[in-house]
């Protein structure tokens, strides 16, 4: 749990903020960093997810969830999914504003080799394909961005689920 709190401190410093103490301030820090990366020529994002989730929540709920995590309390699975959904919707909308492409790699089973994880840390090449892919949630996530006309150019990678993706192709992203 402290890894995330440590990350928030580093993000705040990189964004020129004294602290990140709310979901709203997290979004401001992320906007700041995206603007920096855009100024350096970045135009693509890359997210590796177990699956693309969709559990919408109100702003008040999200602030409560964020504060719970800041206070080192354990989130329920539902709270975690609501937070991740809100996070991904937020960055997706920001990518749209910046005209970035959003890459979603889903179906990832992370850090499968305990020995190498302990030696090298997370995300160092010991991942594999997972077959858990709730396509209805991914469809709802994409639709939430489509209905507000904020879906960025999107590339979705999942070798086990390509047939689920065809319904979201449009002329603008072919």
Feature-to-residue mapping (PLM):
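Extended, charged catalytic domains and RNA/DNA-binding interfaces, predominantly
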Residues: 1-101, 106-129, 144
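Divalent-cation-assisted or electrostatically stabilized phosphate/pyrophosphate-binding catalytic cores
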Residues: 134-137
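Short, surface-exposed connector motifs at secondary-structure boundaries
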Residues: 98, 147-155
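N-terminal low-complexity segments that are often proline-rich with Ser/Thr-Pro
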Residues: 173-174
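Short, basic/hydrophobic alpha-helical segments
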Residues: 141-147
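Extended C-terminal subregions enriched in glycine
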Residues: 154, 158-162
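Conserved small/polar residues in nucleotide/adenosyl-binding loops
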Residues: 163-170
């Amino acid at each position: 749990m402290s890894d995330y709190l440590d990350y928030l401190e580093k993000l705040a410093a990189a964004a020129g903020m004294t602290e990140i103490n709310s979901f709203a301030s997290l979004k401001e820090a992320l906007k700041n960093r995206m603007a920096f990366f855009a100024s350096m020529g970045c135009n693509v994002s890359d997210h590796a997810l177990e699956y693309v989730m969709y559990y919408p929540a109100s702003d008040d709920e999200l602030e409560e969830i964020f504060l719970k995590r800041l206070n080192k309390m354990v989130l329920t699975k539902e709270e975690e999914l609501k937070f991740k959904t809100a996070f991904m919707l937020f960055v997706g909308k920001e990518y749209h504003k910046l005209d970035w492409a959003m890459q979603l790699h889903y179906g990832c089973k992370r850090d499968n080799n305990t020995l190498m994880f302990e030696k090298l840390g997370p995300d160092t090449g010991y991942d594999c394909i997972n077959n858990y892919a709730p396509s209805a949630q991914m469809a709802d996530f994409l639709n939430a961005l489509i209905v507000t006309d904020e879906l960025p150019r999107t590339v979705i990678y999942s070798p086990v689920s390509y047939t689920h993706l065809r319904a979201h192709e449009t002329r603008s992203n072919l």
